[in-house]
């Protein structure tokens, strides 16, 4: 069975859905899942489809030919619709690289979820500016790379070199970089190179409590809700398109340490859920917002 995910954006117009479905049918595919949304303010149309076709035999060359043919047919059928973006994605296990610093909760959770098959991904490697997480990562037989950060420019060059070497070794391109509590600020050049391909998680106290100890600040203010935000990374610090958020109610019984532990739990859950959405090609980015199916 040959299966593709189609991600289509365009200026909303009459006849758009009909043109898409007719093209898919003419190419011999069956639509097994369809989600669509129109932003009424922007007049922007979003559509995600899962389509299938019986084909034998199936090899890499045939899959690539079919992908090109389908994309060409869609662009031709929709050429009169404006602001058009079309993604034709062959369903496959995505290749990801994890970046971390010292904290283990998000990294360990992702390692377990990938190992257990909950996340359809292959972890090419883990990069960290500390050695402390090496024993954890190597328990999963995943390569661990230490990239010290005495100078941020040199550190980024080393990270990029590691990524390139991993891609060459596996003969693939990394689909996604996941910052599992990677506590470094990435440069504009780095984020542009991987636009909408870097996933980050942070506590949702920003921007109210900025600094090294947000939970202490939140405790002193007596906050009643803690949470986490998963987003794509762009050149603006913690301001990229938001993919997923969640919160947890707390009360006066929560100490700073209890808040911190609860915060870790919600961070790893939100990151894992957001990563699953991205791996399944459910996230559309338009301007600085997302549509998630």
Model segments located where?
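Short internal beta-strands
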Residues: 121-132
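Short, glycine-rich nucleotide/cofactor-binding loops
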Residues: 96-105
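Donor/substrate-binding cores of folate-linked one-carbon enzymes
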Residues: 129-130, 151, 155-158, 175-293
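Conserved beta-strand segments of alpha/beta enzyme cores
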Residues: 30, 122, 143-145, 197
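Adenosine-nucleotide cofactor-binding segment
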Residues: 138, 142-171
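Short beta-strand/turn micro-motifs composed of small residues
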Residues: 10, 100, 127-128
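A conserved regulatory-domain signal marking ACT and ACT-like small-molecule sensing domains
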Residues: 1-94
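Histidine-anchored nucleotide/phosphate-binding helix
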Residues: 105-115
